[in-house]
């Protein structure tokens, strides 16, 4: 299951060069592009299957397999928004994490960077108004650097008092080779249920 995603995770940071310009590496680059496109397709299938479990949420597009500098970005993400959400509201998302031998999909309460407004960060910070539930954790960004923060009451208070660029609430779902897409979707849907109160709190006026 999701074999192409798993294989593509090892390509984090690899520079893609158009095959016709890659000289001796032409075949290698053709293989890389084929793998990247197959991995993204798997992520699209997973995201769509999850969307069907998350009515009325609608998925946004899955992130590209490389950035503008043509550096491979295998940790795909996909945002989900409810019909009544405005462009700059806080959203829910899934995002890949890890390396081929130890990887998974995290569910998070986050926002789309390119659509944020002056009020988006203030909305996002409201996730700290609710006590943190078991199995959830924070992902705090400070001066552009993000790091994991254990989900404890002490840390919640610490994050509330300190000004952070961005604080996400996240839930990790490790992926095993033996499980099916349907089983993974159920676990991710459960993650959405766990995080929904934080999403609702963030968007409440």
Where are each of the predicted segments found?
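Long, solvent-exposed, polar/charged low-complexity segments
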Residues: 1-54, 148-205
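Short, Lys/Arg-enriched charge-dense amphipathic segments
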Residues: 9, 77-91, 130-134, 158-168
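Short charge-dense sequence patches
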Residues: 41, 68-78, 139-150
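Short N-terminal edge-element motif at the start of the domain
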Residues: 44-74
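Short, surface-exposed, charge-dense and proline/glycine-enriched linear segments
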Residues: 60, 83-97, 136-142, 166-173
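Aromatic- and glycine-enriched beta-alpha-beta binding-site module
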Residues: 66-129
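Generic structural hydrophobic/aromatic packing signal, biased to beta-strands
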Residues: 78-80, 105-107, 138-139, 169-171, ...
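Short, internal acidic amphipathic alpha-helical interface segments
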Residues: 110-166
């Amino acid at each position: 299951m999701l074999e192409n995603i798993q294989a593509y995770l090892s390509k984090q940071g690899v520079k893609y060069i158009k095959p016709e310009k890659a000289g001796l590496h032409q075949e290698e680059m053709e293989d890389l592009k084929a793998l990247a496109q197959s991995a993204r397709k798997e992520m699209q299938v997973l995201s769509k299957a999850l969307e069907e479990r998350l009515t009325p949420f609608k998925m946004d597009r899955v992130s590209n397999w490389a950035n503008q500098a043509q550096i491979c970005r295998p940790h795909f993400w996909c945002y989900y928004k409810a019909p009544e959400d405005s462009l700059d509201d806080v959203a829910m998302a899934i995002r890949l994490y890890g390396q081929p031998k130890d990887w998974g999909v995290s569910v998070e309460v986050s926002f789309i960077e390119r659509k944020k407004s002056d009020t988006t960060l203030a909305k996002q910070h409201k996730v700290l108004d609710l006590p943190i539930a078991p199995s959830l954790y924070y992902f705090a960004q400070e001066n552009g650097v993000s790091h994991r923060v254990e989900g404890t009451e002490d840390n919640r208070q610490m994050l509330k008092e300190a000004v952070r660029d961005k604080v996400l609430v996240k839930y990790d779902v490790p992926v095993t080779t033996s499980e099916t897409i349907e089983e993974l979707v159920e676990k991710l849907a459960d993650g959405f249920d766990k995080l929904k109160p934080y999403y609702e709190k963030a968007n409440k006026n």
